[in-house]
Protein backbone atom coordinates (compact mmCIF):
# COMPACT_ATOMS: atom_id res chain seq x y z
CA UNK A 1 0.00 0.00 0.00
CA UNK A 2 1.36 3.42 -0.97
CA UNK A 3 0.96 6.08 1.69
CA UNK A 4 0.43 9.64 0.54
CA UNK A 5 2.53 11.54 3.09
CA UNK A 6 5.96 10.61 4.42
CA UNK A 7 6.88 12.39 7.65
CA UNK A 8 10.31 12.44 9.27
CA UNK A 9 10.16 13.06 13.03
CA UNK A 10 13.28 14.17 14.91
CA UNK A 11 14.17 15.60 18.30
CA UNK A 12 17.09 17.98 18.71
CA UNK A 13 18.89 19.95 21.35
CA UNK A 14 21.58 22.42 20.29
CA UNK A 15 22.86 20.22 17.45
CA UNK A 16 20.33 20.44 14.60
CA UNK A 17 22.71 18.55 12.29
CA UNK A 18 20.73 15.41 13.06
CA UNK A 19 18.02 16.64 10.68
CA UNK A 20 20.26 17.03 7.63
CA UNK A 21 22.29 13.94 8.49
CA UNK A 22 19.12 11.84 8.70
CA UNK A 23 17.65 13.25 5.48
CA UNK A 24 20.95 12.54 3.73
CA UNK A 25 20.98 8.97 5.06
CA UNK A 26 17.38 8.35 4.00
CA UNK A 27 17.21 10.21 0.70
CA UNK A 28 20.77 9.88 -0.64
CA UNK A 29 22.73 7.07 1.03
CA UNK A 30 19.97 4.46 1.40
CA UNK A 31 18.58 2.36 -1.44
CA UNK A 32 15.71 2.49 -2.12
CA UNK A 33 15.57 6.14 -1.20
CA UNK A 34 13.04 7.38 1.31
CA UNK A 35 12.39 11.08 0.75
CA UNK A 36 10.15 12.76 3.34
CA UNK A 37 7.35 15.08 2.30
CA UNK A 38 7.59 16.84 5.65
CA UNK A 39 9.85 17.14 8.69
CA UNK A 40 8.54 17.56 12.23
CA UNK A 41 11.06 18.66 14.85
CA UNK A 42 10.50 18.46 18.63
CA UNK A 43 12.87 20.61 20.65
CA UNK A 44 13.33 23.22 23.37
CA UNK A 45 13.29 27.01 23.03
CA UNK A 46 17.07 27.14 22.60
CA UNK A 47 16.99 24.16 20.27
CA UNK A 48 14.36 25.81 18.07
CA UNK A 49 16.51 28.92 17.67
CA UNK A 50 19.55 26.82 16.82
CA UNK A 51 17.57 24.88 14.22
CA UNK A 52 16.14 28.04 12.70
CA UNK A 53 19.50 29.78 12.40
CA UNK A 54 21.50 26.79 11.16
CA UNK A 55 18.96 25.01 9.00
CA UNK A 56 16.33 27.48 7.81
CA UNK A 57 18.08 30.85 7.52
CA UNK A 58 19.25 32.23 4.17
CA UNK A 59 22.83 31.66 5.32
CA UNK A 60 24.07 29.12 6.15
CA UNK A 61 20.68 27.48 5.39
CA UNK A 62 21.95 23.91 5.57
CA UNK A 63 18.57 22.32 4.96
CA UNK A 64 18.02 23.96 1.57
CA UNK A 65 21.70 23.56 0.70
CA UNK A 66 21.41 19.81 1.19
CA UNK A 67 18.25 19.65 -0.90
CA UNK A 68 19.68 21.71 -3.76
CA UNK A 69 23.08 20.00 -3.72
CA UNK A 70 21.54 16.55 -4.14
CA UNK A 71 18.57 17.54 -6.28
CA UNK A 72 15.95 16.50 -3.75
CA UNK A 73 12.32 17.49 -4.35
CA UNK A 74 10.60 20.09 -2.14
CA UNK A 75 10.29 18.99 1.50
CA UNK A 76 8.04 20.92 3.86
CA UNK A 77 10.21 22.13 6.70
CA UNK A 78 9.79 25.65 8.02
CA UNK A 79 9.40 27.38 11.38
CA UNK A 80 5.86 26.00 11.71
CA UNK A 81 7.30 22.47 11.65
CA UNK A 82 9.46 23.16 14.72
CA UNK A 83 7.48 22.31 17.86
CA UNK A 84 8.72 23.74 21.15
CA UNK A 85 8.01 21.63 24.23
CA UNK A 86 6.15 23.57 26.95
CA UNK A 87 5.83 23.02 30.69
CA UNK A 88 2.61 22.38 32.59
CA UNK A 89 1.84 26.11 32.56
CA UNK A 90 2.18 26.32 28.79
CA UNK A 91 5.53 28.12 28.93
CA UNK A 92 8.21 27.10 26.39
CA UNK A 93 11.01 25.08 27.98
CA UNK A 94 14.54 26.38 27.58
CA UNK A 95 15.97 22.96 28.48
CA UNK A 96 14.97 19.70 30.18
CA UNK A 97 16.41 20.13 33.66
CA UNK A 98 14.10 18.29 36.06
CA UNK A 99 11.49 15.55 36.33
CA UNK A 100 8.58 17.83 35.44
CA UNK A 101 10.42 19.04 32.33
CA UNK A 102 10.97 15.46 31.22
CA UNK A 103 7.33 14.61 31.94
CA UNK A 104 6.27 17.54 29.76
CA UNK A 105 8.53 16.32 26.96
CA UNK A 106 7.15 12.79 27.27
CA UNK A 107 3.54 13.99 27.07
CA UNK A 108 4.22 16.35 24.14
CA UNK A 109 6.04 13.71 22.12
CA UNK A 110 3.43 11.04 22.90
CA UNK A 111 0.54 13.33 21.96
CA UNK A 112 2.10 14.38 18.66
CA UNK A 113 3.24 10.90 17.58
CA UNK A 114 -0.22 9.56 18.45
CA UNK A 115 -1.86 12.28 16.35
CA UNK A 116 0.43 11.77 13.35
CA UNK A 117 -0.01 7.99 13.55
CA UNK A 118 -3.80 8.32 13.63
CA UNK A 119 -3.86 9.22 9.92
CA UNK A 120 -3.63 6.01 7.85
CA UNK A 121 -2.18 7.98 4.93
CA UNK A 122 0.88 9.01 6.96
CA UNK A 123 4.08 6.98 6.90
CA UNK A 124 6.31 7.94 9.81
CA UNK A 125 10.07 7.64 10.11
CA UNK A 126 11.24 8.47 13.62
CA UNK A 127 14.88 9.22 14.40
CA UNK A 128 16.08 8.88 18.00
CA UNK A 129 19.54 10.26 17.24
CA UNK A 130 19.14 13.84 18.49
CA UNK A 131 18.24 15.79 21.61
CA UNK A 132 18.50 14.72 25.21
CA UNK A 133 18.73 10.96 25.73
CA UNK A 134 15.32 11.02 27.39
CA UNK A 135 13.81 12.69 24.30
CA UNK A 136 15.12 9.92 22.08
CA UNK A 137 13.73 7.35 24.51
CA UNK A 138 10.30 9.02 24.54
CA UNK A 139 10.25 9.17 20.74
CA UNK A 140 11.08 5.49 20.42
CA UNK A 141 8.58 4.47 23.08
CA UNK A 142 5.83 6.65 21.58
CA UNK A 143 6.33 4.93 18.24
CA UNK A 144 6.21 1.55 19.96
CA UNK A 145 2.89 2.55 21.53
CA UNK A 146 1.29 3.98 18.39
CA UNK A 147 3.34 2.90 15.38
CA UNK A 148 1.80 0.90 12.55
CA UNK A 149 3.21 -1.53 10.00
CA UNK A 150 4.36 1.29 7.71
CA UNK A 151 6.27 3.23 10.39
CA UNK A 152 10.01 2.96 11.00
CA UNK A 153 12.51 3.82 13.76
CA UNK A 154 16.20 4.58 13.25
CA UNK A 155 19.44 6.09 14.48
CA UNK A 156 21.95 7.83 12.24
CA UNK A 157 25.64 6.89 12.43
CA UNK A 158 28.30 9.44 11.47
CA UNK A 159 31.94 8.50 11.04
CA UNK A 160 34.54 10.12 13.32
CA UNK A 161 35.83 12.82 13.44
CA UNK A 162 32.74 14.31 11.76
CA UNK A 163 30.39 12.99 14.44
CA UNK A 164 29.15 15.82 16.70
CA UNK A 165 31.25 18.37 14.82
CA UNK A 166 29.35 21.70 14.94
CA UNK A 167 30.35 22.57 11.35
CA UNK A 168 29.38 19.24 9.79
CA UNK A 169 25.84 18.83 8.46
CA UNK A 170 26.10 16.18 5.73
CA UNK A 171 28.67 14.70 3.33
CA UNK A 172 29.13 17.23 0.55
CA UNK A 173 29.20 16.36 -3.15
CA UNK A 174 32.39 18.32 -3.61
CA UNK A 175 35.29 19.28 -1.40
CA UNK A 176 34.31 21.30 1.67
CA UNK A 177 36.94 21.79 4.34
CA UNK A 178 36.33 22.18 8.05
CA UNK A 179 38.83 22.02 10.92
CA UNK A 180 39.02 19.45 13.68
CA UNK A 181 38.29 20.66 17.19
CA UNK A 182 40.97 21.06 19.83
CA UNK A 183 44.30 22.79 20.30
CA UNK A 184 45.85 21.44 17.10
CA UNK A 185 43.18 21.76 14.38
CA UNK A 186 43.53 19.63 11.26
CA UNK A 187 41.64 20.00 7.97
CA UNK A 188 38.75 17.65 7.24
CA UNK A 189 37.01 17.17 3.90
CA UNK A 190 33.25 16.75 4.41
CA UNK A 191 33.12 14.88 1.12
CA UNK A 192 34.86 11.96 2.85
CA UNK A 193 32.41 11.63 5.72
CA UNK A 194 30.27 8.51 6.00
CA UNK A 195 26.69 8.72 7.21
CA UNK A 196 24.69 5.52 7.62
CA UNK A 197 21.23 4.68 8.82
CA UNK A 198 20.75 2.04 11.52
CA UNK A 199 17.15 0.86 11.44
CA UNK A 200 15.84 -0.26 14.83
CA UNK A 201 13.19 -2.97 15.17
CA UNK A 202 10.47 -2.18 17.71
CA UNK A 203 7.45 -3.87 19.24
CA UNK A 204 4.13 -2.45 18.07
CA UNK A 205 1.70 -2.22 20.99
CA UNK A 206 -1.01 -0.08 19.40
CA UNK A 207 -3.61 -2.83 19.03
CA UNK A 208 -3.13 -3.90 22.66
CA UNK A 209 -4.05 -0.49 24.11
CA UNK A 210 -7.51 0.27 25.53
CA UNK A 211 -9.58 2.26 23.05
CA UNK A 212 -9.48 5.54 24.99
CA UNK A 213 -5.66 5.54 25.00
CA UNK A 214 -5.60 5.43 21.21
CA UNK A 215 -6.83 9.03 21.14
CA UNK A 216 -5.72 10.54 24.47
CA UNK A 217 -3.76 9.95 27.66
CA UNK A 218 -0.46 11.02 29.16
CA UNK A 219 2.75 9.11 28.50
CA UNK A 220 2.86 7.54 31.97
CA UNK A 221 -0.82 6.54 31.93
CA UNK A 222 -0.49 4.98 28.47
CA UNK A 223 2.59 3.01 29.51
CA UNK A 224 0.75 1.81 32.62
CA UNK A 225 -2.16 0.64 30.45
CA UNK A 226 0.22 -1.17 28.09
CA UNK A 227 1.90 -2.94 31.03
CA UNK A 228 -1.33 -4.32 32.50
CA UNK A 229 -0.98 -7.52 30.50
CA UNK A 230 2.07 -8.39 32.63
CA UNK A 231 0.21 -8.13 35.94
CA UNK A 232 -1.78 -10.76 37.80
CA UNK A 233 -5.50 -10.31 37.08
CA UNK A 234 -7.58 -8.84 39.88
CA UNK A 235 -11.36 -8.61 39.69
CA UNK A 236 -13.91 -7.33 42.22
CA UNK A 237 -17.66 -7.68 41.64
CA UNK A 238 -20.03 -5.38 43.55
CA UNK A 239 -23.36 -7.25 43.54
CA UNK A 240 -25.46 -4.34 44.80
CA UNK A 241 -24.33 -1.93 42.07
CA UNK A 242 -23.64 -4.56 39.37
CA UNK A 243 -20.24 -2.90 39.11
CA UNK A 244 -17.06 -4.72 38.10
CA UNK A 245 -13.54 -3.54 38.96
CA UNK A 246 -10.90 -5.14 36.72
CA UNK A 247 -7.36 -4.08 37.61
CA UNK A 248 -8.10 -0.45 38.48
CA UNK A 249 -10.78 0.12 35.84
CA UNK A 250 -14.53 0.09 36.43
CA UNK A 251 -17.17 -1.57 34.24
CA UNK A 252 -20.94 -1.46 34.80
CA UNK A 253 -23.01 -4.33 33.39
CA UNK A 254 -26.69 -5.02 32.94
CA UNK A 255 -28.46 -7.51 35.20
CA UNK A 256 -28.07 -10.62 33.08
CA UNK A 257 -24.49 -10.04 31.82
CA UNK A 258 -23.44 -9.30 35.42
CA UNK A 259 -25.02 -12.55 36.60
CA UNK A 260 -23.25 -14.46 33.81
CA UNK A 261 -19.89 -12.94 34.75
CA UNK A 262 -20.45 -13.58 38.46
CA UNK A 263 -21.37 -17.20 37.70
CA UNK A 264 -18.23 -17.79 35.66
CA UNK A 265 -16.02 -15.90 38.13
CA UNK A 266 -17.31 -18.07 40.97
CA UNK A 267 -16.56 -21.21 38.96
CA UNK A 268 -13.04 -19.97 38.23
CA UNK A 269 -12.51 -19.07 41.90
CA UNK A 270 -13.49 -22.61 42.90
CA UNK A 271 -11.18 -24.09 40.29
CA UNK A 272 -13.99 -25.68 38.30
CA UNK A 273 -13.36 -26.66 34.67
CA UNK A 274 -14.92 -24.99 31.65
CA UNK A 275 -18.61 -25.59 31.40
CA UNK A 276 -20.47 -26.78 28.34
CA UNK A 277 -23.31 -24.30 28.33
CA UNK A 278 -25.19 -26.16 25.63
CA UNK A 279 -26.21 -28.71 28.32
CA UNK A 280 -29.36 -28.21 30.43
CA UNK A 281 -27.29 -28.53 33.63
CA UNK A 282 -25.57 -25.25 32.74
CA UNK A 283 -28.91 -23.47 32.56
CA UNK A 284 -29.93 -24.80 35.97
CA UNK A 285 -26.61 -23.77 37.56
CA UNK A 286 -26.80 -20.27 36.08
CA UNK A 287 -30.40 -19.82 37.16
CA UNK A 288 -29.49 -20.71 40.74
CA UNK A 289 -26.72 -18.06 40.68
CA UNK A 290 -29.00 -15.43 39.16
CA UNK A 291 -31.58 -16.03 41.89
CA UNK A 292 -28.95 -15.07 44.49
CA UNK A 293 -28.21 -11.64 43.01
CA UNK A 294 -31.48 -10.47 41.44
CA UNK A 295 -34.49 -8.98 43.19
CA UNK A 296 -37.15 -11.70 43.22
CA UNK A 297 -39.85 -9.04 42.90
CA UNK A 298 -38.42 -7.53 39.70
CA UNK A 299 -39.58 -10.28 37.38
CA UNK A 300 -36.05 -10.75 36.03
CA UNK A 301 -35.71 -14.30 37.35
CA UNK A 302 -38.99 -15.34 35.76
CA UNK A 303 -37.94 -13.90 32.40
CA UNK A 304 -34.57 -15.70 32.50
CA UNK A 305 -36.21 -18.94 33.59
CA UNK A 306 -38.74 -18.71 30.78
CA UNK A 307 -36.05 -17.93 28.18
CA UNK A 308 -33.96 -20.89 29.30
CA UNK A 309 -36.77 -23.39 29.68
CA UNK A 310 -37.92 -23.48 26.07
CA UNK A 311 -34.31 -23.62 24.87
CA UNK A 312 -33.37 -26.68 26.94
CA UNK A 313 -34.82 -29.02 24.35
CA UNK A 314 -32.28 -27.83 21.75
CA UNK A 315 -28.62 -27.58 22.78
CA UNK A 316 -27.81 -25.02 20.07
CA UNK A 317 -30.61 -22.72 21.19
CA UNK A 318 -29.49 -22.94 24.81
CA UNK A 319 -25.95 -21.94 23.87
CA UNK A 320 -27.36 -19.05 21.85
CA UNK A 321 -28.88 -17.61 25.02
CA UNK A 322 -25.49 -17.22 26.68
CA UNK A 323 -23.49 -16.20 23.62
CA UNK A 324 -24.65 -12.52 23.37
CA UNK A 325 -23.93 -11.98 27.07
CA UNK A 326 -20.50 -13.55 26.76
CA UNK A 327 -19.75 -11.39 23.69
CA UNK A 328 -20.90 -8.25 25.53
CA UNK A 329 -18.65 -8.98 28.51
CA UNK A 330 -15.67 -9.76 26.29
CA UNK A 331 -16.16 -6.56 24.29
CA UNK A 332 -16.29 -4.36 27.40
CA UNK A 333 -13.17 -5.99 28.82
CA UNK A 334 -11.25 -5.42 25.58
CA UNK A 335 -12.46 -1.81 25.26
CA UNK A 336 -11.47 -1.07 28.85
CA UNK A 337 -8.16 -2.95 29.13
CA UNK A 338 -6.96 -3.66 25.59
CA UNK A 339 -6.78 -7.10 23.98
CA UNK A 340 -3.72 -8.52 25.75
CA UNK A 341 -4.72 -7.34 29.21
CA UNK A 342 -8.33 -8.42 28.71
CA UNK A 343 -7.21 -11.91 27.65
CA UNK A 344 -6.08 -12.57 31.24
CA UNK A 345 -9.74 -12.40 32.28
CA UNK A 346 -11.38 -13.78 29.16
CA UNK A 347 -9.19 -16.88 29.26
CA UNK A 348 -9.56 -17.48 32.99
CA UNK A 349 -13.02 -16.27 33.91
CA UNK A 350 -14.98 -16.65 30.69
CA UNK A 351 -13.65 -20.02 29.61
CA UNK A 352 -16.80 -21.61 28.27
CA UNK A 353 -17.21 -24.21 25.55
CA UNK A 354 -20.05 -23.74 23.09
Show which residues each predicted segment covers.
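Long, low-complexity, Lys/Arg-enriched
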Residues: 1-124, 137-354
Amino acid sequence: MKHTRRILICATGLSPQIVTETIYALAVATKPRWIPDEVRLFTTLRGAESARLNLLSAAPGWFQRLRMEYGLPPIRFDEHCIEIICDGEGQPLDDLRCQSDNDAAADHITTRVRALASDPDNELHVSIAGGRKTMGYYLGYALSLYGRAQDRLSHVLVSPPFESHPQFFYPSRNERVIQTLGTNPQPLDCQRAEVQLAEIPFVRLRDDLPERFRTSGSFSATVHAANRALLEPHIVLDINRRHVLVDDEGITLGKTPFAVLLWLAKRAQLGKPAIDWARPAAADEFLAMAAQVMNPMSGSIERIESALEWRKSAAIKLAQYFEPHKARINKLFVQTLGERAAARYINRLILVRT
